[in-house]
Amino acid sequence: MGEGAKMDIAMMMQNLMLAAKAQGLDTCVQAAWNAYHSIVMPLLGAPEDEMLIGAMALGYADQNHIVNTLKPPREAVDNFTQWLWD
């Protein structure tokens, strides 16, 4: 699978996440499963010629759960973005 196909999948997942949020659902993209593809793929009944690119949980987040209170530091958008106007 080429880089272009992986980018297509990423864009599709982003659109699914936006559509889910518009319907009141939450999502959590997970790439950690990729390291366990040899375990996960047989459990899914996936053919040998398929790849695990990522996973996504879909549902209702418990906003009060401790795991959902983590706010990691983030770089300010203006520190890595150049806005071109006019």
Task: Name what the model sees in each region.
Residues M1-L43:
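Small-aliphatic-rich amphipathic alpha-helix that forms the alpha element of a beta-alpha
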Residues G45-E48:
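Short, hinge-like loop/turn segments at secondary-structure boundaries
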Residues L52-D86:
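C-terminal helix-cap and adjacent tail motif
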